[in-house]
Regions:
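Extracellular interaction modules
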Residues: 1-6
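Extended alpha-helical targeting/anchoring segments
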Residues: 7-8, 12-411
Length: 413
């Protein structure tokens, strides 16, 4: 690992994001804490030709742009863990939690690698993208918005021939790229395309969606399920640069987890308040979020809406159910007696809404891996239901298309 720290002058040039986003297999992660102030760190992952793709039972490991390994496995997630175990990223106390490693997504349907009974009930796939896609992130730019610094991070194998000189060459190239005054590769005028509600096409259609809801209600009344979270895909043509969509989302809906990922054939743009799971210092954390009200126009209305939220029996019951679901997920991977609800029903405010949140932690069992943590918590209960497996069976029954990256989990390990 080699780091180079520069001054805040680099940070002020926001076009850094845009210069790098023109390349595939890059990403940008930003954060706004509580929806009200920017988080300390922003991360840019530079382009890589090393990645993993998993579709069905077919895993590809790509090195330097070429398929190095192409295999079918009954345990493809285990194969991903083996790949991760082949390298190590040092912990740096002066840096964010993540400074390189595997970055990408586990789609909603990656749960089928864990719950085998769901493997044969997958709805039709209209997107034809990998269920799991992970970039090997070896070159990063880390913005420290508090210290006013920018850090260039390069990872390489120290046992490789001429390793130190190679480090220096790569760092020099990054400095040149940052200092470049080349024209912006994007058309930033934005706004030429007008998208209305009529532009969107539903994967369901209104009547079929209503029928799906009726069927779910029948299952619920019969006691077969407590909650199911149905979804529908809404699609519309989009001709703007994808980075413009991210810029608009960043402005209109700033959240704790904002992400823009430029992959080979598609982009992922999103903004979320929810962490699925975090493993740090052998403590695993999940953070259930359920129960919502809009923000008030002033402090008095804001407080009135909070009181209404915290007195709503439906919202409280749903949140308690998700706490129980979180305790169950954490309990599967934690040492006996270590599971705790460290925060219970705290109202957090974001730019447009407020949510009820809780915090569930546990001391992770010895010899478990990061992939074991992911397997235990997929997918989020807020996007599936409870009991989770039965809810997903019903989702497969009523939804017309595979969810793909809807309900995905963005991963950095």
């Amino acid at each position: 690992l080699v780091c180079l720290v520069g001054s805040e002058m680099c940070i002020r040039d926001r076009s850094i994001y845009l210069k790098l986003a023109s390349e595939s297999n890059t990403y940008l992660f930003e954060s706004m804490q509580g929806g009200e102030k920017w988080g300390r760190y922003s991360l840019i992952g530079l382009s890589t030709n090393n990645l993993l793709k998993l579709t069905g039972d077919h895993l590809q490991i790509i090195a330097d742009g070429h398929v190095q390994t192409d295999l079918k496995s009954s345990d493809p997630l285990g194969e991903i863990q083996k790949f991760k175990d082949s390298f190590r990223v040092p912990d740096l106390p002066s840096m964010p939690r993540f400074t390189g490693g595997l970055v990408g997504y586990f789609g909603y349907d990656s749960v089928r690698y864990v719950e085998k009974k769901l493997a044969t009930s997958t709805p039709p796939d209209q997107m034809n993208i990998p269920d799991v896609m992970l970039l090997v992130s070896e070159e990063l730019i880390i913005f420290d918005n508090l210290a006013g610094t920018i850090t260039l991070v390069v990872h390489a194998d120290p046992s490789a021939p001429d390793a130190f000189n190679n480090f220096n060459r790569r760092l020099d190239l990054l400095e040149i790229k940052l200092a470049s005054t080349s024209a912006n590769p994007f058309d930033m005028t934005s706004g030429h395309q007008k998208v209305s509600e009529d532009s969107f096409v539903s994967s369901f259609g209104e009547e079929r969606y209503k029928e799906a809801v009726r069927k779910i209600k029948e299952y619920t009344i019969a006691g077969d399920i407590m909650q199911v979270v149905p979804s529908q895909r809404l699609s519309a043509p989009f001709f703007e640069e994808p980075i413009n969509l991210y810029r608009s989302l960043r402005r209109l809906n700033p959240s704790p987890y904002m992400y823009y990922i430029n992959l080979e054939d598609f982009f992922i743009v999103g903004s979320s308040p929810e962490v699925l799971a975090r493993l740090e210092n052998d403590v695993v954390t999940v953070r259930p979020i359920a129960g919502t009200r809009r923000r008030g126009v002033d402090e008095a209305e804001d407080k009135a809406l909070e009181r209404d939220l915290m007195e709503d029996p439906k919202e409280l019951a749903e949140h308690l159910m998700l706490i129980d679901l979180g305790r169950n997920d954490v309990g599967r991977i934690s040492k006996s007696g270590s599971v705790e609800v460290t925060e219970k029903m705290i109202v957090e405010r974001y730019s447009h809404v407020m949510h009820i949140t809780s915090n569930v932690t546990g001391n992770v069992q010895e010899n478990l891996t990061s992939i074991d943590i992911i397997k235990a918590v997929l997918p989020a209960g807020t996007l599936s239901g409870a009991p989770k497996i039965r809810a997903m069976e019903i989702i497969d029954e009523v939804e017309p298309v595979k969810r793909n990256i809807y309900g995905l989990s963005l991963i950095h390990i």
